[in-house]
């Protein structure tokens, strides 16, 4: 392999913003924030919105999505339109 062409691949801690669950893995991602891990070492901390701990597919929980606002917006835009008659 050629030297000095690969990105820095190092341990990083990812934290789920909604559940607070943290896990360590290896990544090329970097961050100015750090956290002390269970082994006593400090690692870069990356906060993410969704992980397997909070995603509905993995948890089995369903979230209620606010579709009423979308439907009302659609009705305002296109509700008064009629189909064109065929000639």
Swiss-Prot record:
Record-linked InterPro entries: Ribosomal_bL28/bL31-like_sf, Ribosomal_bL31, Ribosomal_bL31_B, Ribosomal_bL31_sf
Q: Name one GO biological process term.
A: translation
Molecular function GO labels: structural constituent of ribosome
Q: Does the keyword Ribonucleoprotein apply?
A: yes
Keyword match Ribosomal protein: yes
Question: What's one GO-annotated cellular component?
Answer: ribosome
State the UniProt keywords alphabetically: Ribonucleoprotein, Ribosomal protein
User: Function, please?
Assistant: Binds the 23S rRNA.
Share what the entry says about its subunit structure, partners included.
Part of the 50S ribosomal subunit.
Q: Which family does it belong to?
A: Belongs to the bacterial ribosomal protein bL31 family. Type B subfamily.
The record's listing under NCBIfam families reads:
L31 (TIGR00105), PRK00528.1 (NF001809), PRK01678.1 (NF002462)
PANTHER family per record:
50S RIBOSOMAL PROTEIN L31, CHLOROPLASTIC, LARGE RIBOSOMAL SUBUNIT PROTEIN BL31C
Supply the name of the protein. Answer: Large ribosomal subunit protein bL31B
* Originating organism: Corynebacterium jeikeium (strain K411)
